[in-house]
Amino acid sequence: MNYKYKTVLLKLSGEALKGDAEVYDKKCLEDIASQIIHLVKNGLKLGIVIGGGNIWRGKLGENIGMDAINADYMGMLATVMNGLALESTITKMGYDKIKVYSSLPIKTVTDDYNFKKARIKMNEGFISIFVGGTGYSYFTTDTNATIRAIEIGAEAILMAKNGVKGVYDKDPKQHKDAKFIKKISHQEIVDKQLRIMDLTAATLAKDANLKIEVFDMSGDNNIIKVLENKLESTIIE
């Protein structure tokens, strides 16, 4: 199968796993897993970073008086849970060439992150799920996704959004007159402070000349469609 990229980093939000459920929706997990399996079976080298927002938000920490550093680590642990949930779903659907790499050492259920090992395994057809954030507080999963994409030699980050087809000049959920942007530079994202991703991640991607493609994953097989160039999206480069 000819995809527009050979190696990509897929960035998923934690909310993508929950649907209308409280934490996880079986159908959402299976839909994402089936697309991932299809892609890697057809030759795509794929790394994945998942957020933890379906389980933990920093605001929850604030509400109970938790300091920001501990709250960040709880968010990192939430990404571990999400990575294991996706791994389990993919394995149950019959694809067992998969590794979960954690920046936080949890040897019982994950492998310690090592970009060289991840590259080797991806060349062997393994899916690599990167969890635990960067392993340090004050960094978002957007930043983690950008770092991992650079380290595995990805040609692009596929940034999956829920119900938003790409980048707009302002929040389309709050402003009916928001204008869709087909193509934009990393620097414009930073200068205009567009909240499609955090600015540290945008700056890192700019310095590494790493393309980011923002798309709406909520339609049928949209992860596959964006790689087949059959879906409207925003290119950041």
Curated annotation (Swiss-Prot):
One of its GO terms (molecular function) is ATP binding. Its EC number is 2.7.4.22. UMP binds at G52, D72, T134, G135, Y136, S137, Y138, F139, T140, T141. It holds the Pfam family AA_kinase. Gene3D superfamilies: Acetylglutamate kinase-like (3.40.1160.10). Keywords: ATP-binding, Cytoplasm, Kinase, Nucleotide-binding, Pyrimidine biosynthesis, Transferase. It comes from the Bacteria. It is found in: Cytoplasm. It catalyses: UMP + ATP = UDP + ADP. GO terms for cellular component: cytoplasm. InterPro entries: AceGlu_kinase-like_sf, Asp/Glu/Uridylate_kinase, Uridylate_kinase, Uridylate_kinase_bac. Its main location: cytoplasm. One of its GO terms (biological process) is UDP biosynthetic process. Inhibited by UTP. Pathway: Pyrimidine metabolism; CTP biosynthesis via de novo pathway; UDP from UMP (UMPK route): step 1/1. ATP binds at K11, L12, S13, G14, G53, R57, N162, Y168, D171. CDD domains: AAK_UMPK-PyrH-Ec (cd04254). Homohexamer. PANTHER family: URIDYLATE KINASE, URIDYLATE KINASE PUMPKIN, CHLOROPLASTIC. Catalyzes the reversible phosphorylation of UMP to UDP. Belongs to the UMP kinase family. This is Uridylate kinase. The lineage of its organism: Bacteria, Bacillati, Mycoplasmatota, Mollicutes, Mycoplasmataceae.
